[in-house]
Amino acid sequence: MRFALALLLIASPAWAWEPGPQVLGGLARGPYVEVRPDPDGASGLIRAAEEIAAPPEIVWSLLTDCALAPRLAPSLKSCRILERDPAGRWDIREQISRPGLMPRFRSVVRSDFEAPRRLRFRRTDGDLKVLEGEWRLTPVRDGRATRVVYESRAASPYAVPGSLARLVIRRDVTLAMAALKRESLARAMSPR
């Protein structure tokens, strides 16, 4: 039993990427976004980072707002909560996306929350073959700003050339990080 559990933990994705000094130094110029093929060839690995001049609680409130999600993610057309933990530790969402010129697809995702620091998500149903990852929020500048780190694996439900899929994902993630920053700054500046 212990061996099986250890094997499961080893086989599970480890979301431990931390941006290095070169990435962090470049965040003043805009978000860092990296999209590359997964070594197993079945999916793509996405890594992104951004620094936002707003406290983690503000950024968190935007990341977890299903109604706002289509404004933050360019290819997301709708987001609907199907089930929610009464204690607020998780929810299950149905999302309809239409990236670029590709047909629309449906994904059902369970998100586990460690407010306001970590949001882990994984596919539970839908068209995507693979979808799992996390958002991490780290307070910086004495809590007045937030370092946002995003890491995920995703695989298209359609036969798409890898280079085209990576191009669309890179564009969408870059736009999503910019929208998250824009909305966070607007909320941070608004009178309470």
Q: What are the functions of these language-model segments?
A:
Residues 1-6:
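Sec-dependent signal peptide recognition
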